[in-house]
């Protein structure tokens, strides 16, 4: 059986990147929460 995690920088960025987050209302909330918490990295 193959491993379920097959890393790809492109897919990671498209799914969890900054522009993907900002594209939806809830994604914007995610970024806002992480900013408020003081996260060094906001998105993947």
From Swiss-Prot:
It comes from the Bacteria. Residues 31-44 have a biased composition (Basic residues). The keyword Ribonucleoprotein applies. GO terms for molecular function: structural constituent of ribosome. Keywords: Ribonucleoprotein, Ribosomal protein. Residues 24-44 are annotated as: Disordered. Belongs to the bacterial ribosomal protein bL34 family. HAMAP family: Ribosomal_bL34. This is Large ribosomal subunit protein bL34. The gene is rpmH.
């Amino acid at each position: 059986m193959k491993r379920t995690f097959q890393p790809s920088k492109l897919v990671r960025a498209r799914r969890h990147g900054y522009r993907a987050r900002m594209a939806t209302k809830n994604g914007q909330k995610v970024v806002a929460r992480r900013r408020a918490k003081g996260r060094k990295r906001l998105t993947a």
